[in-house]
């Protein structure tokens, strides 16, 4: 069964169906123009770029009296949302934790938009029990064995899966040896955006799995807390020798977060580190990283 989104972005296609139901002549002409080849660009600006909702379009064209069975053809079905699990089944049996950022943006015409799913989740009462359908799929970040050294890069909500990794390894450390983890986290402001601050600090101290005593490390970059922006790749450069040592020990690399520039910037940082520490040319460092990808030891999970 599909659910329709009256507050979702409507799909005004290049056909005149809506104009058939407009009783006001100027509205009919405008809708017919949108459906014409000449109106294609204006339709894009009005509809897709602004992500106007069904209700907003009907408010803009109040004379349109569409039968329900026609209206549903324009209303988008609700899409499934994909989230990385941010908990370990060893630490939280029968639970699944999610790390969700409330999506918000401003359109070119200064309309404030908020993500439907993330806003809905943020508005839930923590004490209220609700039932939702959930589907589990194999992700792009395989669960690592306890003796595999890890280099984790997770700015923003990209840290979500690595919270589960750290929880899992902390439980595994109680019953046997584990390999070290170093984690690079980044956000804009330490005061406002430092996700799971207490969790990371707890595990990076007192012989925790991220502590230097265990061969690990936790490094945070706060991009807007100083005049010069600092990102995860800058923190990686500061720890280039530690990264190189772990790579020489067979470490796997996991990268998660925004799919804009971050994954490519992180890859370039690894190239620079490998070239610097090994003395090899950048081309050789790039080939070595590609060999890690082919061997299943360089994983990226990115989203827009």
List each language-model region with its residue ranges.
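FNR-like FAD-binding dehydrogenase module
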Residues: 1-304
């Amino acid at each position: 069964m599909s659910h329709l989104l009256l507050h979702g972005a409507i799909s005004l296609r290049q056909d005149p169906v809506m104009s058939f139901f407009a009783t006001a002549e100027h509205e009919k002409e405008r809708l017919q123009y949108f459906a014409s080849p000449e109106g294609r660009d204006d339709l894009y600006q009005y509809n897709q770029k602004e992500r106007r909702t069904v209700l907003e379009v009907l408010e803009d064209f109040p004379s349109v009296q569409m039968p329900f069975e026609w209206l549903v053809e324009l209303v988008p079905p609700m899409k499934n949302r994909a989230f990385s699990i941010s908990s370990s089944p060893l630490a939280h049996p029968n639970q699944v934790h999610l790390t969700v950022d409330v999506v918000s943006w401003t359109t070119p015409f200064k309309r404030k938009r908020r993500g439907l799913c993330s806003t809905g989740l943020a508005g839930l009462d923590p004490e209220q029990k609700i039932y939702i359908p959930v589907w589990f799929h194999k992700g792009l970040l395989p669960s690592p064995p306890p003796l595999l050294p890890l280099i984790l890069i997770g700015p923003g909500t990209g840290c979500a899966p690595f919270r589960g990794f750290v929880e899992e390894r902390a439980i595994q450390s109680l019953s046997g040896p584990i390999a070290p983890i170093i984690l690079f986290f980044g956000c804009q402001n330490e005061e406002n955006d430092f996700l799971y601050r207490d969790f990371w600090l707890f595990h990076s101290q007192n012989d925790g799995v991220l502590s230097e005593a265990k061969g690990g490390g936790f490094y945070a970059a706060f991009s807007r807390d100083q005049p010069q922006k600092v990102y995860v790749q800058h923190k990686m450069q500061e720890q280039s020798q530690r990264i190189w040592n772990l790579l020489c020990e067979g470490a796997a690399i996991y990268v998660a977060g925004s799919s804009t520039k971050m994954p490519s910037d992180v890859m370039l940082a690894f190239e620079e580190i490998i070239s610097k520490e090994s003395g090899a040319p950048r081309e050789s460092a790039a080939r070595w990283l590609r060999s890690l990808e082919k061997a299943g030891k360089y994983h990226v999970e990115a989203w827009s």
